[in-house]
Amino acid sequence: AEAVAVNAAHETAVMVAPFEGEAGFAGLLADARRNALLIGPGAGVGEATRACVHAALTAPSAPSVVLDADALTSFAGDSATLAALISARARPVVITPHEGEFARLFRGHDEVLGAVGKLARARTAAQALGAVVILKGPDTVVAAPDGRATIGCDLPPTLATAGSGDTLAGFVCGLLAQGMPAFEAASAAVWLHGACARALGPGLIAEDLANALPRILQSGDLIANA
C-alpha cells in the first residue's frame, strides 16, 4: 500500500490498485484481465512476498509471472519450493536475477552453481526451475527450460544503475501481457533494454529507459536488428 501511494504521486499515467494482505492480493488476481504479473521490485524480503508469489503461481486465472529482486531473495536457498510451484502450472514464468540474487536463490544447489560458465549456469537453472531465466550482467544470458539460449552482447555499462533491472523486468512483463511467448519476450526485452540505453547515452537513470522505449520501437534499428 505504501508503494502505491508513492507511485500514484508522480506517475500520473499509471493505474494503481492497492491491496492489503493475501486476501486482497487474491482479489486482484481473480480479474482475468490481469494476464501478466511482475513481483519483486520494492516488495520486501520475507513471508509476505513468498505468499504473494505462491498466490500468483497458483491463481486460477493463471497469469504469466515475472519474478525479480525481493521475490527471488524471499526464496533464498529454497529454489526447490519455487520449482514445485512452477511445475504445477501451464503458463510461463520468467525470473530476472543478477548474479547475487542468482547465487542466493540457488544456494545449496550444486548442480546449478557448479555448472561451468554463465551460459551453462543459466541453462541448468532454467531446467531445474522450469522457468525462463534472465541472468543479468554485461553479457546477459536468457535461457529456456528446453535448452534454447540467447546472449545479450555489448550491453552498455550505463545499465549498471539503480532500478535498471526492475525496468527490464517490466519490459518482459509488458511483452508477456501482449501474448509473446516467454523465451521470445525475455530475449526481446533484453535487446530493447540495451537499445534504449545506447540511445540515451551516459547519465541515464532507470526512468529514462521506459521513456525511451517508444522511440526505439518506432526506429529503423529495431527492423535492422530483428
Model-identified regions with their sequence ranges:
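Short, small-residue alpha-helix embedded
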Residues: 104-107, 161-192
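Gly/Ser/Thr-rich beta-alpha loop segments that engage phosphate groups in nucleotides
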Residues: 42-46, 139, 165-168, 172, ...
